[in-house]
């Protein structure tokens, strides 16, 4: 099972690194704030994580509700990283809207994974994780 999880774990590490960069190290992107793409980026990060987990669970012979587990684990990870951002040493803050975006990204991945399953296809397109 661990072999199947390698891409999901790698992506989870990237997410953790991105979410826990100290606030003073973050670049100032004024255009980014204007477009408010932040929530889309958050949703996208956890969409990818949930899709990778669902594919890994499927390939590893996980229980029947593996898509639900992928959603729950990804959403919990997203909420946890937001709480960690609230640590004073990082100079950042937790944001409930980011928690919601993270969870919605994981939920959207679950819908996507179920749709791919019903079509009889791999969850991750193009055979990337076979």
Segments the model singles out, each with a brief description of its role:
Residues 1-96, 103-130:
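Bulky hydrophobic segments
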């Amino acid at each position: 099972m661990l072999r199947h999880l390698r891409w999901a774990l790698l992506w989870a590490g990237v997410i953790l690194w991105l979410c826990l960069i100290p606030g003073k190290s973050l670049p100032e992107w004024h255009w980014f704030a204007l477009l408010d793409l932040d929530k889309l980026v958050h949703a996208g990060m956890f969409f990818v994580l949930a899709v990778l987990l669902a594919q890994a669970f499927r390939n590893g012979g996980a229980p029947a509700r593996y898509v639900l587990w992928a959603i729950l684990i990804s959403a919990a990870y997203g909420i946890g990283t937001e709480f960690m951002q609230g640590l004073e040493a990082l100079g950042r803050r937790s944001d409930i809207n980011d928690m919601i975006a993270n969870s919605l990204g994981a939920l959207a991945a679950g819908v996507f994974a179920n749709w791919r399953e019903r079509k009889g296809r791999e969850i991750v397109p193009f055979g990337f994780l076979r």
